[in-house]
Structures are given as C-alpha cells and as structure tokens.
Amino acid sequence: MGYIKRMALYMSVFLLIIFIVGCRNMKDEQKKEEQTNKTDSKEEQIKKSFEKTLDMYPIKNLEELYDKEGYRDGEFKKGDKGMWTIYTDFAKSNKQGGLSNEGMVLYLDRNTRTAKGHYFVKTFYNKGKFPDRKNYKVEMKNNKIILLDKVEDTNLKKRIENFKFFGQYANLKELKNYNNGDVSINENVPSYDAKFKMSNKDENVKQLRSRYNIPTDKAPVLKMHIDGNLKGSSVGYKKLEIDFSKGGKSDLSVIDSLNFQPAKVDEDDE
C-alpha cells in the first residue's frame, strides 16, 4: 500500500514538473512571437515612412518637384512652399586607406521655382592628412544640369553635366518585396534603421552597376535610415544606402536622399 502511495506521489511531482516546464516554454514562445510582431511592425512603419517619397521615383524630370507638396509642420513659416533637397553620392575605399566620394546635392525652392546646388569630390585619408574637398556650383534649368564654375578636367566636366540622381532612374514602389529586414531602433534620438538583402537581378542594382564602377559580384544590402519621427518631420531626414561593400575595411556604396524642409537662403553655399 505504501509503495502505491509513493508511486502516486512521484507521478504527481513528475506531472507537476512537466506542467511547469510546459508553461515556461509557452511563455517563452509567446514573448518571442510578441518580439517578432513588434519588429515586423516597426519594419512596416519604416517602409511606409519611406513610401511617401519613394512612390514618386523615378522622377525623370526633377522640375516636377516644384509642384509636389511634402510633409509640413510648425517649422514652416506662413506662405513658405518649402524646398526639396535631392542628394546622391558614390563612395568607395581609396588607395590611401581612406574614402573617396563623389556626387551632387540640389536644392529645389518651390517658392522661386529655382534649383541650385553643387557637385562635390571628396577624399578622406586614413592618417595624418586633412581631407580634400572640392565643390563645383551648379544650377538646373529645363531639367538640365548647368555647370557654373570653370572645370579644366574634361572627364569631370562631362560627369557633372551628365549627372543623374538615383531618384531619377530608381523604382522602389515595391518595397513590400523586401522582407525579413534587420531592424534597429534608438528611441532617444529617435532614429530607425532597417537592412534588407537585395538581388543582383533587381533592376535598381542593374542600373547602379551600369552607371558606376562596382568591381564585385556581391549582391548589395539596402539600408534605410530615418532620423526623427516616423510619421514625418522637417527637422529630421531620411536616406537610403545601397551597400556593395565586401566587409572589413572595404567601402563601396551609393547613398540617396530626398527630403522636404522649409526654404533656406544661399543653399548652394552650405
């Protein structure tokens, strides 16, 4: 009789242990699922925040931006129609162990319907030398870049006058095709980052390879960065980076941004 009681007690304890372990595993799975849902939610919010501008891509004629309204908040003065800032640069590691980047920034003032900016060539060195920075003033008329400074280098002059922003040929309307991103958030800034693997079959990747010297077959990573409120902010900014880097000290990427802010004075001197 005592033997049966002991066995019943052992079985009760055993079943209790199984129940406790099962509950704990269930809670762990629930927490994991909640965390996944939270990450997915932020991923979708980041995508939606970018979609507001990326849905306009490709903007083959940049003068269309004069008639495009962006996100407005209390930073805008009464009557200010605002200004679009479009930016693209190509950055790569150089032989000096530093970084070279070349590109253009253009400020399109919706009040005056004028576009001014500059083409830049920058070289950053690894040790003991200040970076070299050269800016060449440009303006845009009839959707054509006009070089305002004298440039002796015929190849550089040609690159400036024929320059196209990423936003003029990119098509990122199907952001939903980029899934399972690596999302990181800094609530203190706030800032939001998402990374998505791209394919070499992607038309945007093919476009970049046809326009820039990209000596690697490695498929790039699409990086999305937001500073400021996800819903929109004239004091924050958003940028895209298509990163072809091999890792380590190798840098090879194209950076693009299109932001809307209150109109400024002497934008091309910034």
UniProtKB/Swiss-Prot annotation:
InterPro entries: Csa, Csa_sf. It is found in: Cell membrane. It comes from the Bacteria. A lipid is attached at C23 (N-palmitoyl cysteine). PROSITE patterns: PROKAR_LIPOPROTEIN. Keywords: Cell membrane, Lipoprotein, Membrane, Palmitate, Signal. GO terms for cellular component: plasma membrane. It is a lipid-anchor. Residues 1-22 form the signal peptide. A lipid is attached at C23 (S-diacylglycerol cysteine). Belongs to the staphylococcal tandem lipoprotein family. This is Uncharacterized lipoprotein SAUSA300_0417. It comes from Staphylococcus aureus (strain USA300). The lineage of its organism: Bacteria, Bacillati, Bacillota, Bacilli, Bacillales.
